[in-house]
């Protein structure tokens, strides 16, 4: 966790914020394009993300973060108490201020979206191999194959996208990536009596409520306990 703490220094935060913005700023239009090709557009919502506050003192704690977003080109809209109620009548009157990120989007069914994308991948000629990756075969600096429990797959290039397990795979290729697990937890409330109209973060409560196809998903707890915990 030492490297994690060091990454929280102000100069590092600014560097990482810029890098993350460049990495993710095109994700919504890109996933919308993929979803359209996979007949999954009905599972994508592009309605924004709302963060709500219980007064100015509550908002002041986040002011630096919002300024950092602004400097990196994130467009936001500040909503007063009345504007909040006009935007979403289901919100509690305890919230007196909100900030809307208009360009954000979300999926109402992650499993359904991935399933349809996978079907399109197969329909386009993709091949699915169920095996555990053990390592790689290289020739100089060139990648020649992926060693799996089902044999070696000959490749010219590969994308390492194995979540927290990517660290050991990258290490085998000589890349030392400061990567560890961040487990997230959520609950889903089926048939809620009321729900926010878009994903909404309670800033002081430190949780996000997201309307989903299967109900209202409430998330906000994470755990740093290592890969083998």
Where are these regions (language model features)?
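Helix N-cap/beta->alpha junction signal
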Residues: 55, 110, 162-163
């Amino acid at each position: 966790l030492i490297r994690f703490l060091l990454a929280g220094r102000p100069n590092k935060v600014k560097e990482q914020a810029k890098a993350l913005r460049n990495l993710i700023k095109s994700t919504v239009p890109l996933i919308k394009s993929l979803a359209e090709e996979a007949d999954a557009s009905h599972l994508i919502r592009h309605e924004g993300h709302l963060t709500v506050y219980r007064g100015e003192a509550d908002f002041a704690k986040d002011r630096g973060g919002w300024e950092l977003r602004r400097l990196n080109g994130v467009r936001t809209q500040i909503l007063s108490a009345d504007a909040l109620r006009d935007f979403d009548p289901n919100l509690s009157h305890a919230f007196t201020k909100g900030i809307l990120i208009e360009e954000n989007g979300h999926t109402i069914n992650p499993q359904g979206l991935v399933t349809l994308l996978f079907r399109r991948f197969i329909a386009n000629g993709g091949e699915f191999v169920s095996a555990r990756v053990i390592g790689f075969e290289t020739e100089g600096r060139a990648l020649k194959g992926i060693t799996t429990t089902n044999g070696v797959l000959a490749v010219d290039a590969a994308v390492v996208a194995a979540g927290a397990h990517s660290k050991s795979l990258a290490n085998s290729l000589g890349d030392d990536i400061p990567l560890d697990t961040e487990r997230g937890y959520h609950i889903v409330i089926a048939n809620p009596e009321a729900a926010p109209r878009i994903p909404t973060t309670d800033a002081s409560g430190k949780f996000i409520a997201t309307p989903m196809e299967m109900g209202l998903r409430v998330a906000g707890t994470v755990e740093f306990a290592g890969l083998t915990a």
